Amino acid sequence: MNFDWIKTRSDFDDDKPAVIDHAKQTSWTYQQLNARADNMAHYLTSQGVKKGDVIGIFAPNDIAILDLLFACFKTGAVFLPLNWRLNPKEIAAIVEDAQLKLLFYAEKHLSSLTDIDQNLLHMDIDVAQYDEIVNPDYHQPFQATPVEPQDLAALIYTSGTTGSPKGVMFSYESFVHNGANLELTYKFNSNYITIVSTPMFHVLGFNDTVLPVLMSGGTLILQRYFNGEELNDMIAQYHPTFIIMIPTMYYSTLRASNFNPENFKAMDYIIQGGSQPLPSIQAAFKQYGINIINGYGLTEAPLVLVNTPENSKRKPMSIGKAVMFVDARILDDNGEEVPTGEIGELAIKAKNVTPGYWNKPAETAKAFHGRYLLTGDLAKMDDDCDIFIIDRKKELIITGGENVLPSEVENALAEHPLVDRCVVVGYDHPKYGESIAAAIILREDEPHYAEILDQHMRSRLAGYKVPRMYVPVTHMPLNSTQKPDKLAIRQMMNDKVSQTL
């Protein structure tokens, strides 16, 4: 079967702008994008690459990522975008686990590749040789290798918040369904424009942005590295139709000196994903009359639920309903559906859900209940079938035998005007098993912040839900995908307690 859809897209939209690199001020049409991929496919074949070989790229948002993606689609090779925020040992572990054959890289990040087999370092994407290989002016058409829908197309490694990163597998079928589901849900067409600021090693940038926009014939604007001020300038210049980012990125754009709410109001969709919805984001943008929509997905099941613009005004914290061709249910610990309004684990069944983890059959089996992926997220559904995320199941704090949802504590804490941002975690306690601590970024210096916040929290929550520690931080620790690093924050709290013993 032929999954070389970029060739089909180029036949219909040959001269339409497909990709614009903002940093290089260079653009490519769909015809040129396909020509680059054809040329790269020929090159990979000349290097002995065969169907099933894993080809990696270690680079910021760059046209080379798309060259290799579509060349892999044409040759049957497996595409692996690597997270350049990881440290050398983490990268080496992924490279070994994935059984990588060749690695393309950006020279700027070469220092992070010291621990891998240096024979795998194939080519710097910024050298003249690379440009000569993919030059669309010298197009060599490539006959795509036949593949089956269930064949492995890509590996994307999780951020490893609960242990070592796992390789999430994507088949050709799951990739195409991912793009098509979102394309149909959002009614994307060739007039759509978006800026890709989220790194393309992340499903939010790759599966949820690149795939649906290019499948619909739209235009991608590449931001090489995210910067809030630069993004605001890019929005003013390119007038995107929609944008999708994680909460920390919205904070940065909002607080940049050049933030212009009118540029955001002009968009059809402004989507918050990649992390639990934050009320503070909605509230901050709402004061400018900007409506932020919540979406939901994870590496194993990219963007499978999303709210609508109208419904998000009535239910701003809902992640909405399942997108087209997705079945979402709330299950108890026995795998049975819970009644409406009750909390259970969100489970997803869809063609775009991963078939499992690379070389990890036991972990794959634990991740599924029948054909439903168990997301690890606690959720509930209301009478309108709108879904609300409550918290991560594994992040539930059990203190003195009582269950405490960190999100409930965070939401109450965020209501106080002193608190800019906060993350709540459990830490080890000799009497209660776990106790509650909050890492907070304060809006202003206040020597009595702990007493003030404690009084505020006790007026809103039961005593056992109130943090025993409030720890101010200047910057919230973030993991490699720029989400709050709760493992690091928990360790910070445990270290702080041990120093006082």
Regions found by a protein language model. Name each.
Residues 42-86:
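Conserved AMP-binding/adenylate-forming
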Residues 240-245, 254-314, 327:
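Gly/Ser/Thr-rich phosphate-binding loop
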Residues 322-325, 336-367, 402-404:
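Conserved ATP/PPi-binding loop(s) of AMP-dependent carboxylate-activating enzymes
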Residues 27-31, 153-177:
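Conserved AMP-binding A3 loop
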Residues 14-15, 139-157, 164, 187-193:
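Conserved pre-ATP/AMP-binding loop-to-beta segment of ANL
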Residues 86, 103, 350, 355-356, ...:
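AMP-binding/adenylate-forming catalytic core of the ANL superfamily
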Residues 176-193, 201-242, 252, 256:
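Conserved AMP-binding/adenylation subdomain of ANL enzymes
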Residues 108-149:
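ANL superfamily adenylate-forming
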